[in-house]
Amino acid sequence: MNVLDNFIKIKNSINSLSNTVKIIVVSKTFDINIINPIIKYGHNHFGENKVQEATIKWQPIISRYPSLKLHLIGNLQSNKAKDAVRLFNYIHSLSSEKLANILMKEENLINKKLKYFVQVNFSNLKERNGIKPNEATSFIKYCINDLKLEIIGLMCIPPLNENPNSYFFELKKIAIENNLHELSMGMSNDYLDALKNGSTYVRIGSKIFGERTNQ
């Protein structure tokens, strides 16, 4: 498994469509030794699902690579917010007023500003994380105006086994309505569709590292 070759191939294919799209290499469950070739190649954006795993993996090497940008792309529990603010630069799963308030307080405690994506949930499943589409605008305004969080864009994960294009289109529509310019959409199986719909951040893991044996 040559992860660097896989990454460069994907990077070149994406750059042929747009050279402004940021590729988040989703390195969850993989050891830092496997990720290292991509770091040494000069890539900066990496994504993780779990705060505890990410802290163990990245904390020892962050000081050696000051340009690294770490993205939390998984669901964030309130009791992990403190550690998340200290480690990550971006959070893609902002989805409740309670969490937003906690993150604001943690930012203020250490005088650090993160960049946030509001996660929009187009599924009717309650266990799916995210704000309902019809509640997105009021939530975005609350986070920006009341809490002074730096909301840069929106994120979504389309429902499984459905054509993602309509969901990507709808997410872009909500972003435009709220004057947000960044869209975190598209993973290994649908990033080309996401790019056609204006994605600015794609989250790619299995196309680079192969299928995970554990989640």
Predicted regions span which residues?
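Conserved alpha/beta-domain cores
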Residues: 1-182, 187-189, 195-197, 211
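Short, basic/aromatic-enriched C-terminal tail that caps enzymatic domains
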Residues: 195-215
